[in-house]
Amino acid sequence: VMSRAAEVTLAHETDLKVEDVRALADRVHAAADIAAPLSSGSFRTLGMVVAPCSVKTMSEIATGVTSNLLARAADVTLKERRRLVLMVRETPLHLGHLRTLTKLAEMGATIAPPLPAFYSEPQTIEDMIDQAVGRTLDIFGLDWARVKRWGRDVGPTK
C-alpha cells in the first residue's frame, strides 16, 4: 500500500518510479481500497511497517480515525496485537508529535525513526538504508544479511 504522499516523496527523493516499487511486492493494494484483505483482523500477518510514516498517518493511526487502507491496516495491526513499526522521519518534533508517539508506543507500536547508525561505519547512503532496514526486520525476527552487528562486524571486539 502506497499513499499518494509516498508516491510524491518517492519521485522527489529517488530515481525510482512507483511501478518499480510495486514490482518488488507480492501483492499491491490501492490506498483507497479499504475492502482489501489487510483491512480485516482475520487476515493474518506477522505485522506491518509504515516506512516512511508521515505525521498525518501517525496521527490517524493513533486516533483510529483512518482515511485510507494504509492507516486502516495499521489500526487493525494494533487492535490484533501484532507488531507495528512506524518509521516516522519528521524533524523537529513538537510536543503534540511526541505525545502522539508516546500514545502509539503505549498502544503497542514500535517507533523506529530511520536514523543513520554511524557505528556501522556506513560508506554510502545505501549502507545507511541497509542498516535501517536490517534493524527494522530484526523486530520481526527476520535476518537481513547486509546489517552490520555490533561486536561481530563493527565495534571493539570485531
What residue spans do the PLM features occupy?
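A cross-family phosphate/adenosyl-ligand binding-site feature
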Residues: 1-85, 91-158
